[in-house]
Amino acid sequence: MRSLLILVLCFLPLAALGKVYGRCELAAAMKRLGLDNYRGYSLGNWVCAAKFESNFNTHATNRNTDGSTDYGILQINSRWWCNDGRTPGSKNLCNIPCSALLSSDITASVNCAKKIASGGNGMNAWVAWRNRCKGTDVHAWIRGCRL
């Protein structure tokens, strides 16, 4: 029993860091944070992007060949948008540590995503959105959700 308690206490901090959202749960959180129709992109676009970027996992990270890393539910890149302390020449245009993008609270990710989408490329900045969501019926991603 004591070893089980020690094991639980060791993994407890990891559980607090990230979260895998349900589709409708994420849609509701994104809507509450102002992403529905942000810069003309419907909520379904954002949910679709999150599905194919991170599979709705706030703790997702992916290392890129250029040495940068993508972080969080929308896989925001450390070369341009956040500071992870290890990406050479990082611009940190969202002025946040990349670790903030791994939280179960997606506020930092959404605020940074708004800055990214406000740039000249809009949601085209997300490769997964371009390849998997753009031009598709993205309303399907929020169908059946009570929003």
From Swiss-Prot:
Which compartments does it reside in? Answer: Secreted
Enzyme Commission number: 3.2.1.17
Question: Which molecular-function annotations from GO does this UniProt entry contain?
Answer: glycosaminoglycan binding; identical protein binding; lysozyme activity
Matches recorded under InterPro entries: Glyco_hydro_22 (IPR001916), Glyco_hydro_22_CS (IPR019799), Glyco_hydro_22_lys (IPR000974), Lysozyme-like_dom_sf (IPR023346)
One short Pfam name that applies is: Lys
Keyword Ribosomal protein applies: no
The regions listed as transmembrane in this protein's record are none
Superkingdom of the organism of origin: Eukaryota
Give GO cellular component annotations, separated by semicolons.
cytoplasm; extracellular space
Cystine pairings recorded for this chain: C24-C145, C48-C133, C82-C98, C94-C112
Give the range the annotation lists for the signal sequence.
1-18
Which key words tag this protein in UniProt?
Answer: Antimicrobial, Bacteriolytic enzyme, Disulfide bond, Glycosidase, Hydrolase, Secreted, Signal
Cite the Gene3D superfamilies for this sequence.
Answer: 1.10.530.10
Please give the catalytic activity noted in the UniProt record. Answer: Hydrolysis of (1->4)-beta-linkages between N-acetylmuramic acid and N-acetyl-D-glucosamine residues in a peptidoglycan and between N-acetyl-D-glucosamine residues in chitodextrins
| Quaternary assembly | Monomer.
In Swiss-Prot or TrEMBL terms, this protein is called Lysozyme C
**Upper lineage ranks?**
Eukaryota, Metazoa, Chordata, Craniata, Vertebrata
